[in-house]
Amino acid sequence: MANVLDTLMERGYIKQFTHEAETRELLEKEKVTFYIGFDPTADSLHVGHFIAMMFMAHMQKAGHRPIALIGGGTATIGDPSGKTDMRKMMTNETIAHNVACIKKQMEKFIDFSDDKAILVNNADWLLNQNYVEFLREVGVHFSVNRMLSAECFKQRLERGLSFLEFNYMLMQGYDFYVLNKKYNCKMELGGDDQWSNMIAGVELVRKKSQESAYAMTCTLLTNSEGQKMGKTVNGALWLDPEKTSPYEFYQYWRNVNDADVEKCLKLLTFIPMDEVRRLSSLEGSQINEAKKVLAFEVTKLVHGEEEATKAKQAAEALFGKGGDMSNVPTYEMGKDKLGSELLDILVEAEIVPSKAEGKRLVKQGGLSLNGEKVADFKKTLEEADFENGEVLIKRGKKNYNKIVLA
């Protein structure tokens, strides 16, 4: 069996190992069951999750078996890693809804047929867990002094860390123990911000089960300046087309900085590395061809080839190269809204997230109506603004929406 580790390292996925040499040997000699956890804090995955699913997909293509663990139980607490404040607690009904939505999305990326992958929810073993038994069985293996030295807790101690959140590491470690017992799961993969929690899981399995256990972390998706990628003017870049349209999704990748093209091609597509190197070596205006390939390939993986083609055609239409403008995200407005302030309509249509953000765009000259910059915050939308029953809104340099009269 070819060692997938070489592929993952060449493409820049791997950040840290618990046992690099043993991990390499294990992946060479057997089909390994591994897991990645996803907390259902929203009803859709976003781009930050997508890189984890690509990690899983590369492993699955190499013959290994993924377990996608949905944290229906741990979500009732909330992961303190990388957070400055305690997360708002969600109701069980909200968590159940989010779990159902995420399951449906995952099945687009990972092959769950014929036991090639497994989908589990840690609510199945955490929610009915006897607390005293849990402390005796799991808590005895954790040192409070060592836990407090973990990066995920150190960042929170000054602002206040609840005992509720302090339990998160034990629960995530217990997940690995349960999966090891039930499915012979030997490895956890996760984002680099999960390193402390993952080490705890590896050590729990090794101490309690006397079994080999390993962890690898995946690099986080950041740009050349070290900032997390996947944010738009409307918030996170979601994988749900109802939250982020395929066109807006396509345009995000079409407009990445030149310095980020190679990293994104490596991490977010299956394009062979020779072609990645060729595309990344393009200079000047030619790098735009690489960005088009990136945008199409990522959109195809997330939304399918048909939606990727529509998004590409819409972009070409808007930039004067022909194509079908019907694929530009469209909002239908009733005639009773004529005379309303443009910014109010844009907020209602979710074209801008808030009126304050709309005002900021206007102030910076970043909002246009039918090609004309909007200069007045209080500009109203009148019937005369509509050409053939529609107006074209432009946000920033390359984000377009249509408003049509219903």
Swiss-Prot record:
A motif ('HIGH' region) lies at residues 40-49. Belongs to the class-I aminoacyl-tRNA synthetase family. TyrS type 1 subfamily. Its EC number is 6.1.1.1. The keyword Protein biosynthesis applies. The keyword Nucleotide-binding applies. It is found in: Cytoplasm. GO terms for cellular component: cytosol. GO terms for biological process: tyrosyl-tRNA aminoacylation. It is an enzyme of class 6 (ligase). This is Tyrosine--tRNA ligase. L-tyrosine binds at residues 35, 168, 172. A motif ('KMSKS' region) lies at residues 228-232. It comes from the Bacteria. The gene is tyrS. CDD domains: S4 (cd00165), TyrRS_core (cd00805). Disulfide bonds: none annotated. It comes from Clostridium perfringens (strain ATCC 13124 / DSM 756 / JCM 1290 / NCIMB 6125 / NCTC 8237 / Type A).
